[in-house]
Amino acid sequence: MQITSIAIVFFAAMGAVANPIARESDDLDARDVQLSKFGGECSLKHNTCTYLKGGKNHVVNCGSAANKKCKSDRHHCEYDEHHKRVDCQTPV
């Protein structure tokens, strides 16, 4: 009887140690991705997106395909710094 009790406690302890602990930073990772998007304005002449980050203007080239180019001058665009992508076709 005593060996059975010790075995149960031993296996319960092993199960507790073997299970991974859930990370709390999963929500923070999602928040960081959301905070890495910056809104800006398109330049039709240069086909670029200019956005403000940290008080400085940054310029990123839009795509050369028809569905990636700027629609019109001063049209809203969005740069995703996490994925390094620019979207010059975002609806306003």
Swiss-Prot record:
Pfam families: Antifungal_prot
UniProt-listed SUPFAM superfamilies: Antifungal protein (AGAFP)
Any one Gene Ontology cellular component term annotated for this protein: extracellular region
GO BP annotations, alphabetical order: defense response to fungus; killing of cells of another organism
Residues making up the signal peptide according to the UniProt record: 1-18
Disulphide bond pairs: 42-70, 49-77, 62-88
Propeptide: 19-34
UniProt cross-references to Gene3D superfamilies, sorted A to Z: Antifungal protein domain
Stated role: Antifungal protein that acts as an inhibitor of growth of human pathogenic molds and yeasts. Is active against the model organism Neurospora crassa, the opportunistic human pathogens Aspergillus fumigatus, Trichophyton rubrum, and Aspergillus terreus. Provokes a reduction of the incidence of infections caused by Penicillium digitatum and Penicillium italicum in oranges and by Penicillium expansum in apples. Low doses of pafB have self-inhibition activity. Also shows activity against the model yeast Saccaromyces cerevisiae and the opportunistic human pathogen Candida albicans.
Name this protein carries in UniProt: Antifungal protein B
Record's keyword annotation contains Protein biosynthesis: no
Induction profile: Expression is strongly induced under nutrient excess during the logarithmic growth phase, whereas it remains under the detection level in the supernatant of cultures grown under nutrient limitation.
Gene: pafB
Statement: the UniProt record of this protein carries the keyword Isomerase: no
UniProt entry keywords in alphabetical sequence: Antimicrobial, Disulfide bond, Fungicide, Host cytoplasm, Secreted, Signal
Domain of life: Eukaryota
UniProt similarity note: Belongs to the antifungal protein pafB family.
Compartments where found: Secreted; Host cytoplasm
